[in-house]
Amino acid sequence: LTIARKAGIPVTSRGAGTSVAGNAIGPGLVIDFSRHMNKILDINPEARTARVQPGVIMADLQVACAPFGLWFGPDPSTKNRATLGGMIGNNACGPHALTYGRTSDNTVSLDVIDGRGRRFTAGRDLDQVPGLTDLVSTHLSLLRTELGRFTRQESGYSLEHLLPEKGSDLAKALVGSEGTCVTVVEATVTLKPLPTRPVLVVLGYPTMVAAASDVVNLLPVEPLALEGMDSRLVDVVRRAVGTVPELPGGDGWLFCEVGEDEGDPRSAVERAADLVAASACVDHRVVEDASEAAALWRIRADGVGLAGRTPAGNQAWPGWEDAAVPPANLGPYLTDFEALMAKYGIEGLPYGHFGDGCVHVRMDVPLSEEGDIPVFKAFMEEAAALVGRYGGSISGEHGDGRARGALLPHMY
């Protein structure tokens, strides 16, 4: 880093390269932390923390923590290869972020090197960076009203964590900055107790929009995960693997996982009953058996991979694959987003972390001809404007990267 700074060479930090928005590529020097800085330095079961280097693979940390009955809550689908450094860069999460939060919510401190070559520990203190306290005091109103409006406001910088009522937490503010502010060389993260005896509740609805519109009624029950999909994704999985487990009646579904929490007397089965009672579903299925639940979750897992092609067999691309809106706006947003895809003749398979308002989709945008690129750009601009109208975030999970950075004016 010293040599790169003196020579004026740009530096890009890279983990496993699992991001899909061009987050880990750039000119100059690309540092692959997975090669040499990949060690778990300490696990403290009493404090429920782990100290790691940025190249540690997420799944390896989970294996190391399991004997203590602990785990790192954010669990992206790429956890068997994604690194903690990459997760810090993108503020990664996953289906259980509804309960355990994003990477920023589970970060205690970061050992970093900034652009001037200063190495320091970023935590709950703004004094490490000259001028940071003045920046916050000068822009208090802006930070309070524009940032941190809902849990998946991933796009841009998370400077709301610098506010005094947020603990003046520089570490959390740096999470999600995609390596543009500092280089992380070590991180201390929070660990949580492993969930015990989870129960899966599958709720059936007439449409996916109806399922999405019911999310706000289910959140008070505090499910561990709340995922949404419809028959299009299920049909793709069925055609690929031959069969899928029986689902409740309907054309759209919510997969809800409930468990037992410390200090809460309710059992997972009682929580499941509460969830069904709170819903507006037309049918439901409560699954206590772990193997049956795993088979149902497999629909979601297989669908993620198979969504790379549409039912017609066309290549489906990322680029606009993880926008998010406040959960209360999810149903209307999905209606308008489907209409926008239809306007451009685009086919896709929406699904996602509906409990957080995050929608994943890959679309069969034509990109083989020279004239296709302006059409795709026009779609992206309209999609970003749509998210902005619903108070959402251009990215709810994967970060902005090169794919979406230019769209930020639709939000800010």
Language-model segment annotations:
Residues L1-V11, L29, F33-P76, I88, ...:
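N-terminal glycine-rich flavin-associated loop
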Residues S13, G22-I25, D32, I40-P45, ...:
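Solvent-exposed alpha-helices and their adjacent loops that cap or buttress functional pockets
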Residues N80-G85, L233, V237:
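Beta-rich nucleic-acid/ligand-interaction surfaces
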Residues F120-G167:
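Phosphate/pyrophosphate- and phosphate-bearing ligand-binding catalytic cores of soluble enzymes
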Residues L163-G167, A171-A378, A384-L386, Y390-S393, ...:
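C-terminal substrate-recognition/cap domain of FAD-linked oxidoreductases
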Residues M411-Y412:
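Cyclic nucleotide signaling catalytic output domains
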